[in-house]
From Swiss-Prot:
Role of this protein: Responsible for synthesis of pseudouridine from uracil-13 in transfer RNAs.
Organism of provenance: Xanthomonas euvesicatoria pv. vesicatoria (strain 85-10) (Xanthomonas campestris pv. vesicatoria)
Keyword Isomerase: yes
PROSITE patterns according to UniProt: TRUD, UPF0024
Descriptive protein name: tRNA pseudouridine synthase D
Length: 369
């Protein structure tokens, strides 16, 4: 397995090539909140529109503005720097006295809404994210592109973890291997990693654990896509309820399951690796174990188990909600859609074709690192 190998496309060969994010306005994201503010309490909810800055930087600015420690500022999820995004932050102000909110507004961020709430904002506390993406220098037949978009809307896409989870050139996965005591030689051989005295911060460790889990999931999903079963049932399937983390099965295939699968009420699932038995069995479990039988995957699995993570599941299939498109110019295509928390817009782009992302790197779904 090579560093640059990419996962398969479920809908066939690429139908376009394009460029994205020559300007932050080409990538717009708005959080879809999970609740309305209570109007009382000691947590000030600020809805911030930011441009060209990442979430951690804005959180630091808010802490400085409020005169509190950074841990007093919370948010539901991390948003990209190279974009125009709208997201909520909660600022803990026990005395319910807020500095001048207008002082926060500048070219990089604007507060578009503020309200008090009785609890701090928790990670993942949102319904999802709505994206408006502008692709420029589009090459490809318009009819084929539109047919692919219609197929994506009808059938969905594989629920890949995006390239940004793994860092540039898969650096986060290599760092996770090192954290687990391994280094990979050019020929793929795993060797003991040199002993390091450097202690990782909790957030760094969490990032590397997530990268390790994500690349293992992508390898299983890649095997299902190659087999053509990413959106259908295998014997021993562990099913995930749409819009939740609830998992059930395996159970015998039935007409009722087929109907639920067809209406996107349930999805096949894959492992987020950790301690414990796989929820799948039979054919599904055999595929998962086979996809993760190489030495690097085995090392990542053992490292995640040693770190104490528990076995969880993630849906293999994802259907973008409200997918719409418009041609702004002959070679400029704008896409709009919503995704659940933890799902990646780059997974949608990957099913269309090869997109060069000026804000980051080429859009690709990594099988290996």
């Amino acid at each position: 397995m090579s560093e640059t190998s990419l996962l398969p496309r479920a809908h066939g060969a690429a139908v376009l090539s394009a460029a994205m994010r020559s300007t932050p306005d080409d990538f717009q994201l708005d959080e879809l909140p999970a609740f309305e503010p209570s109007g009382e309490g000691e947590h000030l909810l600020l809805t911030v529109r930011k441009r060209g800055q990442n979430t951690a930087y804005i959180a630091k600015q808010l802490a400085h503005w409020a005169g509190i420690a950074e841990m007093g500022v919370s948010y539901a999820g991390l948003k990209d720097r190279h974009a125009v995004t709208t997201q909520r932050f909660s600022v803990h102000l026990p005395k319910r006295i807020a500095p001048d909110i207008a002082a926060l507004d500048d070219a990089q961020m604007q507060v578009v809404q503020s309200a008090w709430h009785n609890r701090k904002l928790q990670r993942g506390a949102l319904h999802g994210n709505r994206f408006v993406l502008t692709l420029r220098q589009v090459q490809g037949e318009r009819e084929a592109i539109e047919q692919r978009l219609q197929a994506i809307a009808a059938r969905g896409i594989p629920n890949w973890f995006g390239e940004q989870r793994f860092g540039r050139d898969g650096a986060n996965v290599a760092a996770a291997l090192a954290m687990f005591g391994h280094v990979q030689a050019e020929d793929g051989t795993l060797l003991p990693a040199p002993t390091s005295r450097r202690r990782l911060r909790n957030d760094q460790r969490s990032m590397l654990l997530s990268a390790a889990r994500s690349v293992l999931f992508n390898r299983v999903l890649g095997a299902r896509v190659a087999q053509g079963s990413w959106d259908s049932a295998l014997q021993g399937e562990a099913w995930m309820l749409d819009g939740s983390r609830s998992v059930f099965g395996p159970e015998p295939w039935s007409e009722a399951l087929a109907e639920r699968l067809a209406r996107f009420d349930i999805h096949p699932s894959g492992p987020l690796w950790g301690v414990g038995d796989l929820r799948s069995a039979d054919q599904a479990a055999a595929l998962e174990q086979g996809a993760l039988s190489d030495p690097q995957s085995e090392a990542l699995r053992q490292g995640l188990e040693a770190a104490g993570l528990k076995q969880e599941r993630r849906a293999l299939r994802l259907r973008p909600q409200g997918l719409d498109y418009r041609w702004l110019e002959a070679q400029t295509l704008q896409l709009e859609f919503a995704l659940p928390p933890g799902c990646y817009a780059t997974a949608v782009l990957w099913e269309l074709g090869d997109v060069t992302d000026a804000g980051r790197f080429n859009v690709g779904m990594r099988a290996d690192a």
